[in-house]
C-alpha cells in the first residue's frame, strides 16, 4: 500500500464508539433504511445496499436522512414498533462486518421544502390546509423559524413553528434515538445546521426573527439544535454518540443568491467568525462530531 493512504485504514472514535477505519459513506438520497414517503416502512433494498457497503470495508455508514416526522406532517418516526423489531436482527447481521452505522435524523425542511403548485395553493389557504392535513399538512411541512419565503415557490410563505411544536419535536428526537439504540444502531447524526435546512434556518440571523428563547442571540438561535442533543442524551444515554451535519460557511448573498468559490461578497448567512463561536456552543451541548461542508443550495 502507498504510505500516503495508510491513515485511511486507522481507527478513530466518535464519542466512545470506535470506527474501524476512516472510510465513511455519508447520507445520500435513495439509501434510507425506513423509506421516504412510505410511513412505517423498512426498506429492504436500501438495507441490502448498506450491508454490502459494510462488507466491502466501509468503516462508518450513514443511511439517507430520515425525517423525524414524516414529510407531510403525520406520523412520528418513533411511533411504529414493528419497524424497530425488523431493524434489530438487521443490525445484528450488520455488526458481523465490524462496521458501524449511524442513522441521520432530520428536523425537516422548513422554507427549503420543495412544493408543487397544488401544495403551494393548499399552504396559502388555512381552511383547505386544515381539511387536507390528515393526508398532507403543507403548512407544517414548510414551517420554519420565522415567516420567510419558500425556496421554490414565490407565492408561499413559511409559518413560524410554535414553541410547543419545537419542544414536541425535540422530545421525539430523543424517543427515536432511544429506540434506535435499543435496536443496535451505533449512533445518530442530526440533520442539520447546514445548507439552509430547518435547523439552519433557526441558526441564521437573517432567517430567524423570533423574540422568544429560540431567536435573537447566537445561543438562542442554536437552542433548537442544542436541545435535541441534550434530549437524546437524556433518553438514549450520555454515552450514545451524536453527530451533527454542519455547514461552516453558508456562502450566500441573499434570498436564493448563492456565492461562487473565490467570489468576494458579503455573507448573508453564517460566516467563519460566527462559525467559530457556534461550534463551541454545539460541542459544549454534547455533539461528539461535526460532519462539515460549506455552502447552501
Predicted regions located by residue number:
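Flavin-dependent oxidoreductase catalytic cores
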Residues: 1-297
Amino acid at each position: 500500500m502507498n504510505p500516503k493512504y495508510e491513515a485511511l485504514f486507522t481507527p478513530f472514535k466518535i464519542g466512545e464508539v470506535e470506527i474501524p477505519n476512516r472510510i465513511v459513506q455519508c447520507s445520500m438520497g435513495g439509501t434510507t433504511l425506513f423509506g421516504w414517503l412510505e410511513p412505517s416502512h423498512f426498506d429492504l433494498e436500501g438495507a441490502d445496499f448498506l450491508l454490502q457497503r459494510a462488507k466491502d470495508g466501509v468503516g462508518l455508514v450513514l443511511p439517507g436522512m430520515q425525517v423525524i416526522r414524516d414529510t407531510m406532517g403525520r406520523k412520528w418516526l418513533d411511533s411504529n414498533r414493528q419497524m424497530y423489531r425488523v431493524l434489530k436482527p438487521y443490525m445484528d447481521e450488520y455488526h458481523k462486518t465490524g462496521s458501524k452505522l449511524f442513522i441521520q435524523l432530520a428536523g425537516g425542511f422548513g422554507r427549503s421544502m420543495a412544493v408543487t403548485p397544488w401544495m403551494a395553493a393548499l399552504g396559502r389557504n388555512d381552511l383547505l390546509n386544515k381539511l387536507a392535513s390528515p393526508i398532507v399538512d403543507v403548512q407544517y411541512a414548510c414551517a420554519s423559524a420565522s415567516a420567510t419565503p419558500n425556496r421554490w415557490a414565490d407565492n408561499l410563505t413559511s409559518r413560524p413553528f410554535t414553541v410547543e411544536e419545537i419542544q414536541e419535536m425535540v422530545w421525539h428526537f430523543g424517543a427515536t434515538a432511544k429506540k434506535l439504540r435499543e435496536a443496535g444502531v451505533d449512533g445518530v447524526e442530526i440533520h442539520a445546521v447546514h445548507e439552509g435546512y430547518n435547523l439552519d434556518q433557526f441558526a441564521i440571523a437573517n432567517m430567524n426573527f423570533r423574540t422568544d428563547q429560540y431567536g435573537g442571540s447566537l445561543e438562542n438561535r442554536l437552542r433548537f439544535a442544542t436541545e435535541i442533543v441534550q434530549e437524546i442524551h437524556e433518553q438514549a444515554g450520555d454515552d450514545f454518540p451524536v453527530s451533527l451535519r454542519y455547514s461552516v460557511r453558508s456562502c450566500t448573498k441573499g434570498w436564493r443568491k448563492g456565492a461562487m468559490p473565490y467570489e468576494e461578497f458579503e455573507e448573508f448567512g453564517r460566516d467563519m467568525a460566527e462559525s467559530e463561536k457556534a461550534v463551541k456552543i454545539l460541542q459544549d451541548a454534547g455533539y461528539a462530531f461535526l460532519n462539515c461542508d460549506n455552502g447552501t443550495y
